[in-house]
Amino acid sequence: MTDISSNPEGEVLLLDKPLTWTSFDVVRKVKNTLRIAKIGHAGTLDPLATGLLILCTGKKTKQIDQIQAQEKEYTGTFRLGQTTPSFDLETAVDAERPYVHLTPAEIEAAATRFVGVIEQTPPLFSAVKIAGQRAYELARKGATDTVIKSKTVEIKTFELTRIALPEVDFRVVCSKGTYIRSLARDLGTALSCGAHLTGLVRTRIGEFRLADALTLDAVQALAPPRPATDDAARRPRRERQQKPPAPRAGLEFYAAQQASAAPVTSAADAPATTN
């Protein structure tokens, strides 16, 4: 790849977004690493999703709207029988309902109801603007009566690739603006058991595929060398103090859950209990 920072035409970069990183985290990292003046992303991914994030630099930023409008493909996992306010693992379970009576045929039949052009209501924990504020800002302040307008989206494919209750793995091909977290909620409602999203990977945007994406480590390897100066050669370089990463608002519960789920060894090796 050519020196991205000096390419006047710009680049379309495919990135594999890490778990818990925001889309802006990735943009900032790439901007600083490659020293790019103009850069933006073509479609947000939630912090708890991973996969394809497209970044455009220089003149290629004019293509952002065109790329955003293309269909998306996702794979992931729903957890039946439990709901959360955010429809994913960002918040604690707020309700549990029976699910063991459901058959694969019933779950498949419910999924088919969401294929095609549908009306979908975005999650309260989303970037949708309400009276000038992001919905997630209102949600984190405890607002529960916020009304979010539904919008028209298209689910082109909703394939259930594995059913191992309470988990259901899926593949979805959908239009711009579709919330997979909302699809989890709606499927759970259709099954009268509730559901939330426990894992999500974006595998494709139009013809751009995750298989062709760079990791952030690969981006680091593309960093242009810093120009040496006489002053820099004479002066010893000061070691920068490593700052602890800033806490990401909204992921405190997820981080605590992951910490508590860390394996603990014991002499007894007692089996874990289930709810």
For the regions a protein language model found, what residue spans apply to each?
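Catalytic/RNA-binding core of pseudouridine synthases
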Residues: M1-N275
